[in-house]
């Protein structure tokens, strides 16, 4: 599937098996990125959006540039996508005000470690010096509790509210947030907690060697 969709023999054959859905979609309102199309120079439709998006990624970005950005901006800088304790230390060194432990929902690199698995080592490295948040894999209130009990200051969601948006629009987003809130409330009650600030490792049973011995294996491979 591409954006915008391209009519190929394969997609046409697929559409032929779903003709009722196809007819319904023909009469549906056209969707676009209203916060970008028509507001950014040179972006007038969805077709030109892809090229513009690709141009926003700077392959030469490094820690020195982040430090310079922090200096020029003068405001708070939060770095998302940290999956390694050494990167967390570098984020602290260049002046980041907080970091988000994230593998971007697992949609950038299929083999990336899960955020929750690397969270303990990152907290051990910098958790007492910088706020550490987490996203990727948060689907329920129980997931929120697990992350915060391990030491994250907060969590973020993506797909969870998008599902609600797709099903019911704005009301669906509100419903998704309420569901997660109720799940968190219920889970806390069953754990004997009334305040998220009181959550901790005592609320969890973490499997032995949960983080894995990744560094040891890497070292052995380089020996």
Task: Describe the role of every protein-language-model region.
Residues 1-93, 105-108:
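Active-site entrance/lid segments in N-terminal catalytic domains of soluble metabolic enzymes
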Residues 32, 117-135, 139-223:
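Alpha/beta catalytic cores of nucleotide-metabolism and tRNA/nucleoside-modifying enzymes
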Residues 50, 103-113, 162-165:
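Glycine-rich, proline-tolerant flexible connector loops at the mouths of alpha/beta enzymes
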Residues 61-66, 71, 113-127:
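Short loop-to-alpha-helix "cap/lid" segments that border enzyme active sites
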Residues 72-76, 92-106, 126-129, 151-155:
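Glycine-enriched alpha-helix->loop->beta-strand junction motifs that scaffold or abut catalytic
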Residues 89-90, 110-112, 144-146, 167:
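Short, well-ordered secondary-structure micro-motifs
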């Amino acid at each position: 599937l591409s954006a915008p969709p391209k009519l190929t023999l394969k997609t046409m054959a697929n559409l032929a098996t779903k003709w009722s859905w196809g007819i319904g979609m023909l009469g549906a309102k056209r969707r676009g990125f209203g916060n970008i199309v028509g507001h950014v120079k040179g972006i007038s439709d969805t077709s030109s959006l892809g090229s513009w998006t690709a141009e926003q990624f700077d392959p030469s970005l490094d820690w020195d540039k982040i430090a310079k950005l922090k200096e020029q901006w003068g405001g708070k800088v939060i770095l998302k996508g940290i999956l390694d304790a050494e990167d967390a230390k570098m984020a602290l060194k260049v002046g980041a005000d907080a970091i988000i432990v994230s593998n971007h929902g697992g949609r950038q690199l299929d083999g990336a470690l899960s955020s929750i698995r690397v969270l303990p080592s990152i907290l051990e490295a910098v958790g007492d010096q910088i706020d550490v948040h987490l996203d990727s894999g948060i689907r329920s209130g129980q997931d929120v509790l697990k992350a915060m009990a391990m030491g994250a200051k907060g969590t973020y969601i993506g797909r969870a509210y998008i599902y609600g948006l797709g099903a019911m629009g704005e009301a669906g987003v509100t419903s998704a947030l309420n569901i997660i809130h109720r799940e968190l409330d219920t889970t806390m009650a069953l754990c004997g907690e009334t305040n998220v600030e009181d959550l901790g490792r005592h609320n969890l049973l973490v499997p032995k060697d949960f983080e894995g011995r990744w560094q040891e294996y890497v070292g052995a491979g380089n020996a």
